[in-house]
């Protein structure tokens, strides 16, 4: 199934400031950016010329990047952008997500249709990460790599109408002490009843959906 480009982020509270999905294409720069100091949001895609997408390094106030069907070179390049606060990655096959672990100021993370990797532990380096949206992570079924992510307040895990995201168990919730919103979409629960007992450890939980 191709990506829906709908906006499924919970816009209540301060969990998300990332632009809606459908707006990503408006931020692709296939031209020379004149006012680089004013640029805060950009989208990078494999369809861009190198001299165009590399302008990300010349925008000192850049806060948000969408990697839409990117090349491996583009993905590795953003490791240098340690000041960005928001990252969306869509349509990419990665052996690991170590490149995300270098983005120490990241607050919001969206991974959509990102396959090939299984280990989520690089995210533990992100001590400011407050919101995560996972959608269609083909090789991931164990979410224990999130344990210890104390800054996390919002977590959404989803599949699609034609593929349910497997979740081995929910023990990882015990390691998310500040989680306020826990949201599930199309998933397969691989644990027998009562699978959701770990949710009782979430003392700050405000919403389940």
Where are these regions (language model features)?
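Concave beta-strand-loop units of leucine-rich repeat
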Residues: 2-98, 102-209
